[in-house]
Amino acid sequence: NLLHKLNIMAGLRADYSSEYGIFLTPRVHAKWEIIHGLTWRASAGKGYRTPMPLAENNFMLASSRKMVIPDRLKQEEAINVGTSLNALIPLGEREVSLTVDFYRTNFLEQVVRDVDSSTDKVVFSDLEGTSFSNAFQAELLYEIFKGFTVNAAYRSNVVKQTISGQLREMPLTSRYKGLLSMSYATRMKKWQFDLTSQFNGGGRMPDPDALNPLWSTEFKPFTVVNAQVTKNFKRWSFYAGAENLLNFMMDNPVIGAADPWGKDFDGTMIWGPVHGRKIYAGLRFTINDYN
């Protein structure tokens, strides 16, 4: 009977806040092993969060923008649902692990950080309209031959929020991300070789001043590649590697950097690497080996 392998767990949590009173947080999880090597999971629930706009957005102080925060903001409230399917697929003498996920968060109440209406201030307010986040991810893991593993993943992000009466993409949020990593370990793990590529999609920038645009309306996709080689001894490990091998950097990460006290200064428009290629080397010493 397939239903014998279906597990469902539900819960309900009650909280009391001196500011917001009593609120309930329901949650349900399900897991179903449909057949051997094919597992389905799902979850749904409701969540609350007390906003602290200044503490959570203190990075905005690295700009000349004035922060406008009302005396009282509503407690954030969201419904989240998600599902995933994991399959173990025989391929040769090994198995490919394939996982597909989809998660959605729908905000009923949310604090909106508006950096679009004006370039000289950031305005915090309660949500008036729709706000949601959809995330789809697929991941593949496979050991091609003994010691050599490949991991590939792709994630699509659709994050939108009502800002000044318009449903728009959240600024400075990549529309997609990708990962490709390869790892090879020799016999007895005497040598370890790792190569990782991170793919970052483009996205929307906060609206620039229409009369004096100091940045683009979009940021472009970019790729970051890291590599490392490790030589292992009984207690010592020597390693060397490089970060950001392609040496990709933002052209002008800080707006108005020449005049930090000017009205155009803004160090919050960071969407990519601000440091170039880095070469490093080091060693590790293991005091206790529990293996």
Annotate each PLM feature.
Residues T39-L88, G202-P206:
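Outer-membrane beta-barrel translocator/channel fold
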Residues L12-S18, A44-T50, N57-F59, A87-I89, ...:
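Transmembrane beta-strands of outer-membrane beta-barrel pores
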Residues Y20-P26, P53-F59, K66, Q110-T119, ...:
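Outer-membrane beta-barrel translocator domains and adjoining extracellular loop/strand segments
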Residues V150, R187, F199-P206, T230-N291:
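C-terminal beta-signal and adjacent terminal beta-strands/loops
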Residues L12, L24-A30, I69, I79-T83, ...:
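Hydrophobic, lipid-facing positions within transmembrane beta-strands of outer-membrane proteins
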Residues H4-I8, S97-N106, D126-P208, R284-N291:
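Gram-negative outer-membrane beta-barrel transporters
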Residues N1-H4, A14, I22, W32-E33, ...:
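Residue-level signature of outer-membrane beta-barrel architecture
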Residues E33, T39-R41, K74-D126, F132:
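Membrane-embedded beta-barrel scaffold of Gram-negative outer-membrane proteins
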